[in-house]
Amino acid sequence: MPKTVITPPGTGTPIAPFSPGTLADGIVYVSGTLAFDKDNNVAFPGDAEAQTRQVLETIKSVIETAGGTMEDVVMNHIFLTDWVHYAPMNKVYAEYFPGDKPARYCIQCGLVKPGFVVEIASVAHIGKP
């Protein structure tokens, strides 16, 4: 199965060996996405709303680079460091998914660096039926 690595223009170097996204058979797999600043530091430490917005903008960029839109998202995997971030994350999340909602799950866990409070990985189906 052929696959294409998706790296939006202006994307920084990942802190680990992975691609921002991979397109295979009309499906875009977006890696777990965190709110990094341009220097690979934590952006908006502890701010769930600001981090969620940046994360979803990054995910949107990956999907659009692959030829899709946020309406093509079929699944989101959400990771929060604490349940106090659930409501602020959902507030921003609802702005990006105003119509039919994709499937999702949300778990509480530790993240790669202190200050990160939200991570999201997504799957979007951009292929034609």
UniProtKB/Swiss-Prot annotation:
Its EC number is 3.5.-.-. GO terms for molecular function: deaminase activity. InterPro entries: RutC, RutC-like_sf, YjgF/YER057c/UK114. It is an enzyme of class 3 (hydrolase). Keywords: Hydrolase. The keyword Disulfide bond does not apply. CDD domains: YjgF_YER057c_UK114_family (cd00448). GO terms for biological process: nitrogen utilization; uracil catabolic process. The keyword Hydrolase applies. It catalyses: (Z)-3-aminoacrylate + H2O + H(+) = 3-oxopropanoate + NH4(+). GO terms for cellular component: cytosol. It holds the Pfam family Ribonuc_L-PSP. PANTHER family: 2-IMINOBUTANOATE/2-IMINOPROPANOATE DEAMINASE RIDA, PROTEIN HMF1-RELATED. Involved in pyrimidine catabolism. Catalyzes the deamination of 3-aminoacrylate to malonic semialdehyde, a reaction that can also occur spontaneously. RutC may facilitate the reaction and modulate the metabolic fitness, rather than catalyzing essential functions. Belongs to the RutC family. This is 3-aminoacrylate deaminase RutC. It comes from Caulobacter segnis (strain ATCC 21756 / DSM 7131 / JCM 7823 / NBRC 15250 / LMG 17158 / TK0059).
